[in-house]
């Protein structure tokens, strides 16, 4: 009976990867805590407010105006990360940041570069805060005894609601496993387009099903791998390939797709043997280079 010997260098490399992953998770958690520092401040006491603030009051009008404004927004498209009326914005923001942290870890496991992931994440968090925490209007320095009437409240609420409706949705970018450049984003508008995209991807993969592609190995060399070694159904490969940034757009335009990048993506997610053989950092660079080369054509 043959025995399987494990190379000690492979074990050490695996342990090093685990330690790096733990350090990365700790760094992400610290960054999230830093971004939440403004939520941990001391509450404002009413007695400590300026005298001008104490003179502010709301006119006791019926809430029918607010109800009308809420009904105006019914039937319109609601942004993915836009909060519902009556929900605690701080709790929703905390939940949103938790999801962002989980998504960052997933993207790093898939080989994405941390700096690229973090720059995109910062933009998404800023957009979320801009939509759901609009800055209050500044008071005039000349009129210190301003009274907030029901008419002013209606104007402010309407402007805030219109601002939310006009903001572009970036939560879809967070929901992707590994988001690509915004210019590469595309989604099928109907079932017919989606089927044509899948057919184009399947056609190109089937033509190169047995072709071997070079990948960097952990032993500082290379190894050959092809779609046949995945032992997967073609439909499953196509479904996974559609998650590669830019592939659906290229297939929709009838252009060539980066097959080596697609193979590396699918194998990294579904083949344990491939995960043990490949050097993740070098693979990430190769896949990114392939994407850039094909999408720039």
Swiss-Prot record:
Keyword NAD part of the UniProt annotation: no
Motif Nuclear localization signal, residue range(s) on this chain: 211-214
Biased composition (Polar residues): 158-169
Post-translational modification: Phosphorylated by host PKC and by an unknown kinase.
Gene3D superfamilies per the UniProt record, alphabetical: 6.10.140.1560, Phosphoprotein, C-terminal domain
GO molecular function, one term: molecular condensate scaffold activity
Effect of mutating residue 122 to I: In strain: CVS
Motif (Nuclear export signal): 49-58
Function: Non catalytic polymerase cofactor and regulatory protein that plays a role in viral transcription and replication. Stabilizes the RNA polymerase L to the N-RNA template and binds the soluble protein N, preventing it from encapsidating non-genomic RNA. Also inhibits host IFN-alpha and IFN-beta signaling by binding and retaining phosphorylated STAT1 in the cytoplasm or by inhibiting the DNA binding of STAT1 in the nucleus. Might be involved, through interaction with host dynein, in intracellular microtubule-dependent virus transport of incoming virus from the synapse toward the cell body.
Family: Belongs to the lyssavirus protein P family.
Protein name: Phosphoprotein
Organism: Rabies virus (strain CVS-11) (RABV)
